[in-house]
Amino acid sequence: MHLRQFLYLTFFLFIPSLLAAQPCREVSAYFPSWKWYNRGQLVNPASIHYEKYTTIIYAFFKPNPDGSISPFDPVADKTLLLGEAAPGIPRAYLGKKDFGNPDWHNDRNSLVKRAHSEGVKVVISVGGWTLSDQFSSIAASAEKRRRFAHSCNEMVRVYGIDGIDIDWEYPGFITNKGSADDKYNFTHLLQAVRDSLDALEFQRGRHLSLSAAFGVAPTRMAEIEWAKVVHLLDHINLMTYDFYGNSFATTNHNAPLYSPEKGLNGYDTHSAVRHLMERYGVPSWKINIGLAFYGRSLKTKGAAGLHVSSRQLPDTKTFPEDGGTPMFRPPT
């Protein structure tokens, strides 16, 4: 999926993820940097209702071939995470793909400053669908893992964030240059980041979280060493959406809570959570389920309906604004 499609189909404005156990302990929300440009910058650090969340996940930073991490959009990333740039800074500064210099920004309206003033944490997510093609080679190299972990610590230092989220889509996924060794190398990568954050925790005197996003198809879950990984992570963020879409020959629910009348076994939120808990022993209090604030539209070969033959194309005529993806927008 290309970046433009990814914007439409996956992380919209905020997609809360709610802990499977009750009562709910964690409500996180993605802040995609590219959405800052939309609708006159309507979604910005000053417009967020922080009281609704415990954590804001800022998406996404880019893993580089050498294992380092860089901003994907340095202008948006520096402005949103550090605040407005001060007058008189070098003209090329904002566009440079480094983490930035906090001394050159007014942090009064930064996402981090605003969130912290409301008791909300901020973490940066590294990767995402279009930025996952370097993870396999990074995870396979001890030197690249070290450099990756060092970059994670630098992001904590520069931005004052509360942790790191890893969004590798997906270990073992050939389309994103995955390999059979990813299952084991992903564990090594998480261990390197956790060890590095632990060392920084000791210096700073506060906990730094580590979370990761996971595909929930049974084949995706099988590519993770859960018994080892679960102890390294504070939160396991399940991508319980995009179960079905235009890659399927028949129409179905995008993000079903329970198993649809027709469809693949295990392709629903309830089954995914039970599978993770019962087969792999993951504790419920670490699991966050993802809620999709969008739907799917599909052109059909005959009459519109559920479980009917699809032309595998979105209905951009009915839903032109977001590439054929109907999505929830609260009144402004």
Which residues does each PLM region occupy?
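Bacterial Sec-dependent N-terminal signal peptides
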Residues: M1-Q22
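A generic secondary-structure signal
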Residues: L111-R114, S151-V158, S196-L200, H275-R279
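Substrate-binding surface in catalytic domains of secreted glycosidases
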Residues: S28, P32, N38, P71-I89, ...
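Extracytoplasmic/periplasmic, Sec-exported soluble proteins
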Residues: I48, F99-D107, A140-F148, V158, ...
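Short, well-ordered coil/turn segments that N-cap beta-strands
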Residues: C24-R25, K52-T54, E118-V122, G160-D162, ...
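Mobile, glycine-rich extracellular loop/lid and propeptide segments
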Residues: V123-G128, Y159-P171
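Glycan-recognition patch characteristic of GH18 chitinases/ENGases
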Residues: Q22-V156
